[in-house]
UniProtKB/Swiss-Prot annotation:
Gene3D superfamilies: RNA Polymerase Primary Sigma Factor (1.10.601.10), Winged helix-like DNA-binding domain superfamily/Winged helix DNA-binding domain (1.10.10.10). This is RNA polymerase principal sigma factor HrdA. Residues 33-42, 56-75 have a biased composition (Low complexity). Sigma factors are initiation factors that promote the attachment of RNA polymerase to specific initiation sites and are then released. Residues 357-376 bind DNA. Belongs to the sigma-70 factor family. Residues 1-20 have a biased composition (Basic residues). InterPro entries: RNA_pol_sigma-70_dom (IPR014284), RNA_pol_sigma70 (IPR000943), RNA_pol_sigma70_r1_2 (IPR009042), RNA_pol_sigma70_r2 (IPR007627), RNA_pol_sigma70_r3 (IPR007624), RNA_pol_sigma70_r4 (IPR007630), RNA_pol_sigma_r2 (IPR013325), RNA_pol_sigma_r3/r4-like (IPR013324). GO terms for molecular function: DNA binding; sigma factor activity. Residues 1-96 are annotated as: Disordered. It comes from Streptomyces coelicolor (strain ATCC BAA-471 / A3(2) / M145). It comes from the Bacteria.
Amino acid sequence: MRGGQRRASRLRPPTYRRRPPPAASILEVAPVQTQTLTQTDTAAGGAEPDAERGVLLAMPAQPGAGAALPHPGAPVDVPEHPEPPPPTRTESGGPSSDLFRQYLREIGRIPLLSAAEEVDLARRVEAGLFAEEKLRCSPGLDDRLALDLDRLVVLGRLAKRRLIEANLRLVVSVAKRYVGRGLTMLDLVQEGNLGLIRAVEKFDYARGYKFSTYATWWIRQAMSRALADQARTIRVPVHVVELINRVVRVQRRMLQERGCEPTPQEVAAHLDLAPERVGEVLRLAQEPVSLHAPVGEEDDVALGDLIEDGDAASPVESAAFLLLRQHLEAVLSTLGERERKVVQLRYGLADGRPRTLEEIGRLFGVTRERIRQIESKTLSKLRDHAYADQLRGYLD
């Protein structure tokens, strides 16, 4: 009998138990990638992660809310979105390049968003900003309404962070176009992330545009402003940098069309500017060069060694000054100690700084009139000296 039951059990098809479907929830937070990218902003939100989780569980379920954020195991409808580029040559080598590669790996793990998910997140961001403004401007709200607004603020911040993280690789893609203009890749990405945050706050989902199309403008604007403010050794105002870019673009276009370099007058006529203004802009467009920059292949000659010093005396002037000094010393050696000292102080022959009669009088303890008499007597004696004719030759 037992053998028959065993045979019957072998012939019976196996049965499987179905797992119960998961309960509906309003928001599923993206899986934690790294502590740097996905840690909760407790300082800005004013709530701990456990408190935010309690807020999410307390919210009633809404139709279609479960699709706001993709489940870790669910397939993601990947829209057209740039992939994180490989590190550039400027970022190769050194600890900063290792950090940048780690950053690329981290943002590459974050799942992208579909168009519907972007709209849903943007709607929550807008509701959170509205609730935050309402709480700030209306302090006399009842407790229940204030609690509901707090929930909207928390949900808005979570949606804002999710929308930012999903578009971090867009910033890296845009930053590739600005490499080599004065800022490193890390600095460009940092400035572009600030523009991305601004784009999330200003995005209007009701217009029907993709978020990446709208955010690209803000990212480029942030990078361009950073290049204008930080890229140059000598800072130039932003409006002057924009004018420089206009002049350079016109120069390049005219060079391609004509095959020769346009003159400042031609560029000024094309831009409806004064030729003097164009010349000044072209002068400001020049980049400074270090005087210690090596010249040649040997690297033993610096650029500063080849630049003429306009203030330096010529060899002829140096030789004439040396002869004049020798003749003056020969003439002054014929005077007394007091007379020689007065002439040297009066005309600055010792240190190059002439003294007044009062200053010399205080040094010798006599009046300025007495110093004037000594000076007059000494000059009369020098005029009749044998070297007087030689000294007059230096006056020509």
